[in-house]
Swiss-Prot record:
This is ATP synthase subunit a. The gene is ATP6. GO terms for molecular function: proton-transporting ATP synthase activity, rotational mechanism. Mitochondrial membrane ATP synthase (F(1)F(0) ATP synthase or Complex V) produces ATP from ADP in the presence of a proton gradient across the membrane which is generated by electron transport complexes of the respiratory chain. F-type ATPases consist of two structural domains, F(1) - containing the extramembraneous catalytic core and F(0) - containing the membrane proton channel, linked together by a central stalk and a peripheral stalk. During catalysis, ATP synthesis in the catalytic domain of F(1) is coupled via a rotary mechanism of the central stalk subunits to proton translocation. The lineage of its organism: Eukaryota, Fungi, Dikarya, Ascomycota, Saccharomycotina. Its main location: mitochondrion. HAMAP family: ATP_synth_a_bact. It is a multi-pass membrane protein. PANTHER family: ATP SYNTHASE SUBUNIT A. Belongs to the ATPase A chain family.
Length: 246
C-alpha cells in the first residue's frame, strides 16, 4: 500500500550487507535484473529464430523491422553498425515502462537520476564517437555552414549549449513523462477509492471517474511505447550528427 504518491518511486533495500563496505540490493536493482533477463530471453528467441508465425512472432518481427527502418532512415548506410545498440535500448525502455504499469511494481524509467545518468553516458559516447571518426573536425558541428564570420562566436556558443543540453534532456524527457503519468494515475485512483468508500452515493458517483482512470491507464500504455520510440529516434539523430556532422 502506498501512503504517499511518491512512495512508489522510493528506493527500498531488499538485501543489505554491511561490513567494511556497505552493499545493498534495492527494488531498483531487482527490476533492473528482471528487465535484463527478459531482454536476454527476447534476444535469444530472435537469434535462434524461434518466433514462428504466431501473433507474438509477428509482433516481434514488426518491432525489429520498425527500429531497423528507423535507424537506416536516420543514420543511412552506416546504420547497421549502431542498430544493435538502439534496438537493445528501445527494448529495455519499452519493457521497463510496461512492467511499471503492473500495479505495485516499480518504475525504473521514473528514477530521474538513473535515466539522466544513462542519457549522459550515451551523450559522452556520442562525443567520443565523433572525435574518433573526425578528430578535431568534429567541432565543425557547432559552426553551421554559410555562417557569417562575425556571427561565428555567438552561434558556436549557442550550438555548444544546445548540444550539451542533450546530455540531460534525453533522459529527463523520458523520466518526467513516466513520473507524471504514474503520479496522475495513483492520485486519481486514491481519490476515487476515498470517494467510493465514503457512502453509497459516493460509490455510485465514483463509477464515472473510474472510466476516466481506465482511459488514462490506456493512454499511459501508449505513452510507455511512444517514449521508448521517441528515445530511439533522438538517439539515432544524435548518432547521425556524430557520424555525418550534420
Amino acid at each position: 500500500m502506498f501512503y504517499s504518491p511518491l512512495d512508489q518511486f522510493e528506493l527500498k533495500p531488499l538485501l543489505l550487507i554491511t561490513d567494511n563496505l556497505t552493499f545493498s540490493i534495492t527494488n531498483y536493482t531487482l527490476y533492473l535484473i528482471i528487465v535484463s533477463l527478459i531482454i536476454i530471453f527476447y534476444s535469444s528467441i530472435i537469434r535462434h529464430n524461434y518466433l514462428g508465425s504466431s501473433r507474438w512472432g509477428v509482433s516481434v518481427i514488426a518491432i525489429y523491422d520498425t527500429i531497423l527502418n528507423l535507424v537506416n532512415g536516420q543514420i543511412g548506410r552506416k546504420g547497421g553498425y549502431y542498430f544493435p545498440l538502439i534496438f537493445t535500448i528501445f527494448n529495455f525502455i519499452l519493457i521497463a515502462n510496461l512492467i511499471s504499469m503492473i500495479p505495485y511494481s516499480f518504475a525504473i524509467s521514473a528514477q530521474l537520476v538513473a535515466v539522466v545518468s544513462f542519457s549522459l553516458t550515451l551523450w559522452i559516447g556520442n562525443v567520443v564517437l565523433g572525435l574518433y571518426l573526425h578528430g578535431w573536425g568534429f567541432f565543425a558541428l557547432f559552426v553551421p555552414s554559410g555562417t557569417p564570420l562575425a556571427l561565428v562566436p555567438v552561434l558556436v556558443l549557442i550550438e555548444a549549449l544546445s548540444y550539451a543540453s542533450r546530455a540531460i534532456s534525453l533522459g529527463l524527457r523520458l523520466g518526467a513523462n513516466i513520473l507524471s503519468g504514474h503520479l496522475l494515475m495513483l492520485i486519481l485512483g486514491s481519490l476515487i477509492i476515498s470517494l467510493m468508500s465514503s457512502s453509497f452515493l459516493g460509490f455510485v458517483s465514483g463509477i464515472i471517474p473510474i472510466l476516466a482512470v481506465v482511459a488514462i491507464t490506456i493512454l499511459e500504455f501508449g505513452i510507455a511505447i511512444i517514449q521508448a520510440y521517441v528515445f530511439s529516434i533522438l538517439l539515432s539523430g544524435y548518432i547521425k550528427d556524430s557520424v555525418e556532422l550534420h
